[in-house]
Protein backbone atom coordinates (compact mmCIF):
# COMPACT_ATOMS: atom_id res chain seq x y z
CA UNK A 1 0.00 0.00 0.00
CA UNK A 2 1.07 3.56 -0.71
CA UNK A 3 2.65 5.21 2.32
CA UNK A 4 3.81 1.96 3.96
CA UNK A 5 7.52 1.16 4.01
CA UNK A 6 8.40 -2.28 2.66
CA UNK A 7 11.16 -2.75 5.27
CA UNK A 8 11.02 -1.17 8.70
CA UNK A 9 13.82 -0.28 11.05
CA UNK A 10 14.46 -1.05 14.72
CA UNK A 11 11.94 0.81 16.85
CA UNK A 12 10.44 2.47 13.78
CA UNK A 13 6.98 2.44 12.30
CA UNK A 14 5.38 -0.78 11.10
CA UNK A 15 6.28 -2.05 7.66
CA UNK A 16 4.77 -4.33 5.04
CA UNK A 17 7.43 -6.92 5.89
CA UNK A 18 6.49 -6.92 9.60
CA UNK A 19 2.81 -7.36 8.71
CA UNK A 20 3.59 -10.26 6.36
CA UNK A 21 5.74 -11.90 9.04
CA UNK A 22 2.80 -11.82 11.46
CA UNK A 23 0.83 -13.85 8.93
CA UNK A 24 3.47 -16.02 7.22
CA UNK A 25 6.10 -16.42 9.94
CA UNK A 26 9.36 -14.79 11.00
CA UNK A 27 11.34 -16.21 8.08
CA UNK A 28 9.33 -14.30 5.48
CA UNK A 29 11.48 -11.71 3.70
CA UNK A 30 10.81 -9.00 1.15
CA UNK A 31 13.00 -9.59 -1.91
CA UNK A 32 12.98 -5.96 -3.08
CA UNK A 33 11.74 -2.53 -2.01
CA UNK A 34 9.38 0.07 -3.39
CA UNK A 35 9.50 3.77 -2.57
CA UNK A 36 7.00 4.79 0.11
CA UNK A 37 4.70 6.43 -2.45
CA UNK A 38 4.94 3.70 -5.10
CA UNK A 39 2.13 1.15 -5.18
CA UNK A 40 2.28 -2.34 -6.58
CA UNK A 41 3.41 -5.91 -6.24
CA UNK A 42 5.99 -6.82 -3.59
CA UNK A 43 7.60 -10.24 -3.83
CA UNK A 44 8.22 -12.17 -0.57
CA UNK A 45 9.97 -15.46 0.14
CA UNK A 46 8.42 -17.52 2.93
CA UNK A 47 11.58 -19.41 3.88
CA UNK A 48 15.36 -19.30 3.41
CA UNK A 49 15.31 -21.84 0.55
CA UNK A 50 13.05 -19.63 -1.59
CA UNK A 51 14.77 -16.48 -0.39
CA UNK A 52 18.12 -17.76 -1.74
CA UNK A 53 16.60 -19.04 -5.00
CA UNK A 54 14.68 -15.85 -5.77
CA UNK A 55 17.49 -13.54 -4.62
CA UNK A 56 19.73 -15.32 -7.12
CA UNK A 57 17.23 -14.60 -9.90
CA UNK A 58 17.30 -10.89 -8.97
CA UNK A 59 21.12 -10.91 -8.98
CA UNK A 60 21.22 -12.60 -12.40
CA UNK A 61 18.63 -10.14 -13.81
CA UNK A 62 16.22 -13.00 -14.58
CA UNK A 63 13.25 -11.20 -12.98
CA UNK A 64 11.47 -8.73 -15.24
CA UNK A 65 9.49 -5.91 -13.67
CA UNK A 66 6.65 -4.08 -15.41
CA UNK A 67 5.60 -0.63 -14.20
CA UNK A 68 2.68 1.53 -15.27
CA UNK A 69 2.74 5.30 -14.94
CA UNK A 70 0.49 8.23 -15.75
CA UNK A 71 2.70 10.99 -17.09
CA UNK A 72 2.07 14.62 -17.86
CA UNK A 73 2.09 15.40 -21.56
CA UNK A 74 1.49 13.55 -24.79
CA UNK A 75 4.19 10.86 -24.96
CA UNK A 76 5.91 10.73 -28.34
CA UNK A 77 5.18 7.21 -29.62
CA UNK A 78 8.59 7.17 -31.31
CA UNK A 79 10.24 7.15 -27.87
CA UNK A 80 10.32 3.48 -26.92
CA UNK A 81 13.75 3.31 -25.31
CA UNK A 82 15.68 5.65 -23.03
CA UNK A 83 19.33 4.97 -22.31
CA UNK A 84 21.10 7.40 -19.94
CA UNK A 85 23.53 7.40 -17.05
CA UNK A 86 22.16 8.15 -13.58
CA UNK A 87 24.10 9.80 -10.77
CA UNK A 88 23.74 12.14 -7.82
CA UNK A 89 23.81 15.74 -8.93
CA UNK A 90 25.61 18.58 -7.11
CA UNK A 91 22.37 19.41 -5.27
CA UNK A 92 22.25 15.86 -3.85
CA UNK A 93 19.32 14.72 -5.99
CA UNK A 94 19.45 11.91 -8.55
CA UNK A 95 19.55 12.94 -12.18
CA UNK A 96 20.29 11.87 -15.75
CA UNK A 97 23.80 12.42 -17.07
CA UNK A 98 25.49 11.97 -20.42
CA UNK A 99 28.83 10.87 -18.96
CA UNK A 100 28.75 10.38 -15.17
CA UNK A 101 27.07 7.68 -13.11
CA UNK A 102 25.80 4.21 -13.90
CA UNK A 103 24.21 3.08 -17.17
CA UNK A 104 20.40 2.88 -17.07
CA UNK A 105 18.09 1.51 -19.75
CA UNK A 106 14.27 1.44 -19.84
CA UNK A 107 11.97 0.45 -22.68
CA UNK A 108 8.55 2.08 -22.93
CA UNK A 109 5.23 1.39 -24.62
CA UNK A 110 2.36 3.85 -24.82
CA UNK A 111 -0.84 2.28 -23.45
CA UNK A 112 -2.97 5.40 -23.82
CA UNK A 113 -2.36 8.98 -24.85
CA UNK A 114 -4.13 12.31 -24.70
CA UNK A 115 -3.09 15.93 -25.05
CA UNK A 116 -2.41 16.49 -21.34
CA UNK A 117 -1.62 13.00 -20.03
CA UNK A 118 -0.34 9.63 -21.23
CA UNK A 119 -0.39 6.13 -19.75
CA UNK A 120 2.88 4.26 -20.30
CA UNK A 121 4.31 0.84 -19.58
CA UNK A 122 7.94 0.92 -18.42
CA UNK A 123 10.21 -2.12 -18.49
CA UNK A 124 13.49 -1.32 -16.73
CA UNK A 125 16.44 -3.33 -18.00
CA UNK A 126 18.67 -2.06 -15.18
CA UNK A 127 17.72 -1.21 -11.61
CA UNK A 128 18.95 2.28 -10.80
CA UNK A 129 17.59 4.60 -8.12
CA UNK A 130 14.64 6.62 -9.52
CA UNK A 131 15.37 5.23 -13.00
CA UNK A 132 11.83 5.26 -14.39
CA UNK A 133 11.03 8.68 -12.93
CA UNK A 134 14.18 10.12 -14.47
CA UNK A 135 13.63 8.44 -17.83
CA UNK A 136 10.06 9.77 -18.03
CA UNK A 137 11.47 13.21 -17.25
CA UNK A 138 14.08 12.74 -20.02
CA UNK A 139 11.21 12.01 -22.43
CA UNK A 140 9.62 15.33 -21.44
CA UNK A 141 6.72 13.62 -19.64
CA UNK A 142 7.21 13.59 -15.84
CA UNK A 143 5.16 11.14 -13.76
CA UNK A 144 2.09 12.93 -12.41
CA UNK A 145 2.51 14.11 -8.83
CA UNK A 146 6.21 13.45 -8.32
CA UNK A 147 8.15 15.84 -6.10
CA UNK A 148 9.34 18.98 -7.83
CA UNK A 149 6.83 18.51 -10.67
CA UNK A 150 3.74 17.93 -8.50
CA UNK A 151 0.48 18.72 -10.25
CA UNK A 152 -1.80 21.18 -8.52
CA UNK A 153 -4.14 19.15 -6.37
CA UNK A 154 -2.31 15.82 -6.83
CA UNK A 155 -2.11 14.06 -3.47
CA UNK A 156 -0.11 11.08 -4.73
CA UNK A 157 1.88 10.08 -7.74
CA UNK A 158 0.60 7.73 -10.38
CA UNK A 159 3.18 5.00 -10.57
CA UNK A 160 2.79 1.29 -9.80
CA UNK A 161 4.79 -1.92 -10.07
CA UNK A 162 2.22 -3.94 -11.99
CA UNK A 163 3.85 -7.33 -12.55
CA UNK A 164 6.86 -9.62 -12.31
CA UNK A 165 7.89 -12.28 -14.79
CA UNK A 166 10.40 -14.93 -13.75
CA UNK A 167 11.19 -18.64 -13.91
CA UNK A 168 10.25 -20.55 -10.75
CA UNK A 169 13.36 -22.32 -9.50
CA UNK A 170 13.09 -25.95 -8.43
CA UNK A 171 9.84 -26.34 -10.38
CA UNK A 172 10.87 -25.57 -13.96
CA UNK A 173 7.89 -23.22 -14.37
CA UNK A 174 7.50 -19.57 -15.32
CA UNK A 175 5.52 -17.10 -13.21
CA UNK A 176 3.92 -13.93 -14.50
Predicted regions, residues:
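RNA pseudouridine synthases
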Residues: 1-105, 111-114, 158
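Beta-strand scaffold of nucleotide-dependent catalytic cores
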Residues: 82-84, 120, 133
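Ser/Thr-glycine-rich phosphate-binding loops at phosphate-binding pockets of nucleotides
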Residues: 38, 45-47, 124-134
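A structural micro-motif recognizing beta-strand termini
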Residues: 72, 122-125
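Hydrophobic residues embedded in beta-strands of well-ordered beta-sheets
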Residues: 93-94, 118, 173
